[in-house]
């Protein structure tokens, strides 16, 4: 006779798992009913701030303390003068763009928060998926669709983190080139172009973050009954 298969846990381990599940469900409930609406309102207010409504992008430019070298000598100068090499003036400490850094200080935590909340929702729904068996699986299909969408949001948020890291890398390269090739003005212009471009990226990120939270609220609240009770069983709460 075949032995029944299953995971056997000690009484203490089962208790700890149950505590984890209860805490998870409470976090999910708080996220849906309190955190989500408050976060949508906050991001909406943030988008009304002057710092996210700059019309003159030139005002975002940070000063580049990179000395401009003297023009090259004329052809008719004496040969002895040409042989006298002048050292290229060196630049000192080059800070980042303070205005952009201030915006990043606001946006980066929001990106991290949404990523963590997506993980929370994914874990919560995964713990609500019932035992796989014959019967009415319509609710399970809804759970899977919601999971698919939340994972898609998480992937897009992770792309925001890549965009932010890429900004520092590309701006750093542009500053390095501008400080090395001090006579090439295009490298200086490239630094300003990166600052202006990332400003648009950061505003778009906040717009997307607000939209993602609104989407999560809609898709979860609209399908909450099937998410928490996929088999149509009687349950007193959202878990």
Swiss-Prot record:
What are the alphabetically sorted keywords of the record? Acetylation, Phosphoprotein, Proteasome
The residues the entry assigns to the signal sequence are none
Indicate the quaternary assembly. Answer: Heterodimer of PSME1 and PSME2, which forms a hexameric ring.
Give the span(s) annotated as Disordered: 65-86
Is the keyword Nucleotide-binding in the record?
no
Q: What organism does the record attribute this protein to?
A: Bos taurus
Which residues are recorded with the post-translational modification Phosphoserine? 10
UniProt GO molecular function = endopeptidase activator activity
Write down what this protein is called: Proteasome activator complex subunit 2
Q: Per the similarity annotation, which family is this?
A: Belongs to the PA28 family.
Functional note: Implicated in immunoproteasome assembly and required for efficient antigen processing. The PA28 activator complex enhances the generation of class I binding peptides by altering the cleavage pattern of the proteasome.
Basic and acidic residues compositional bias, start-end: 72-86
**Family annotation (Pfam families):** PA28_C, PA28_N
């Amino acid at each position: 006779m075949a032995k029944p298969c299953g995971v056997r846990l000690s009484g203490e381990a089962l208790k700890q798992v149950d505590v984890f599940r209860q805490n998870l469900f409470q976090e999910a409930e708080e996220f849906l009913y309190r955190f989500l609406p408050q976060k949508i309102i906050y991001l909406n207010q943030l988008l009304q701030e002057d710092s996210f409504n700059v019309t003159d992008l030139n005002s975002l430019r940070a000063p580049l303390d990179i000395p401009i070298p003297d023009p090259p000598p004329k052809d008719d100068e004496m040969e002895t003068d040409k042989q006298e090499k002048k050292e290229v003036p060196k630049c000192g400490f080059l800070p980042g763009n303070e205005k952009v850094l201030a915006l990043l200080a606001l946006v980066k935590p929001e990106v991290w928060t949404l990523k963590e909340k997506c993980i929370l929702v994914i874990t919560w729904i995964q713990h609500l998926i019932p035992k796989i068996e014959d019967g009415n699986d319509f609710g399970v299909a809804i759970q899977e669709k919601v999971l698919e969408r939340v994972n898609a949001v998480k992937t897009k948020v992770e792309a925001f983190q890549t965009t932010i890291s890429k900004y520092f890398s590309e701006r750093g390269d542009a500053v390095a080139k501008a400080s090395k090739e001090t006579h090439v003005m295009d490298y200086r212009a490239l630094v300003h172009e990166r600052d202006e471009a990332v400003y648009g990226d950061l505003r778009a990120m906040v717009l997307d973050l607000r939209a993602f939270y609104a989407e999560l609220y809609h898709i979860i609240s609209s399908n909450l009954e099937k998410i928490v009770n996929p088999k149509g069983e009687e349950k007193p709460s959202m878990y």
